[in-house]
Regions:
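N-terminal beta1-alpha1 cap of cysteine-dependent amidohydrolase-like domains
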Residues: 1-58, 62-71
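C-terminal and late-domain segments of enzyme folds
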Residues: 10, 115, 134-137
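Active-site oxyanion/phosphate-handling segment shared across diverse enzymes
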Residues: 120-137
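A conserved hydrophobic position in a structured secondary element of the catalytic/binding core
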Residues: 44-47, 77-78, 133
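A residue-level signal for conserved active-site and pocket-lining positions in enzyme catalytic cores
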Residues: 3, 110, 133
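Cysteine-nucleophile active-site neighborhood
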Residues: 49-120, 124
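Structural signal for conserved beta-strand scaffold positions within catalytic alpha/beta enzyme cores
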Residues: 5, 28, 77, 98-101, ...
Length: 137
């Protein structure tokens, strides 16, 4: 099994780290030629959906990736990845893959500036680093 991770922008490194910890081989998708090989699934990471969509089109990856998803390639999508898949975006007229029959709302929980990081100590556990981000819904 080999999983592809869209690596043109966004939080792809975190997904790669987790796949690595699980012992799952992965490859980064950065250019059209990376889509020639067939993969067992793809991760569409969080990041900025408008930038990811623009880069996918500029790199001539958009149509091929959309076709592979339409043909049934399994997808794990987080944040911006969900927006790329959504059939409809409530507060944005841009369209991307439109392969998932859901409606999402961009920046539903606030802008990126509303995100923050904090370390909190929990009794009996210790200090836990926590990142709170805005996300679509």
């Amino acid at each position: 099994m080999v999983i592809a991770v869209l690596a043109v922008q966004g939080a792809f490194a975190e997904h790669e780290q987790m796949l690595g910890r699980l012992g799952i081989p992965y490859v980064e998708l950065r250019k059209k030629e990376d889509l020639i090989q067939k993969y067992d699934g793809i991760v569409l990471p969080g990041g900025e959906s408008t930038v990811q969509g623009k880069l996918l089109k500029e790199l001539d990856m958009f149509d091929t990736l959309k076709q592979q998803i339409q043909e049934g390639m399994p997808v794990l999508a987080t944040c911006a990845g969900l927006i790329l898949l959504a059939d409809s975006i409530e507060n944005d007229d841009r369209e991307y893959f439109k392969t998932l029959p859901v409606t999402v709302k961009r920046n539903a929980y606030g802008r990126q500036l509303g995100s923050f990081y904090v370390e909190q100590e929990f009794k009996g556990i210790g200090v836990i680093p926590m990142t709170f981000i805005r996300a679509p819904y």
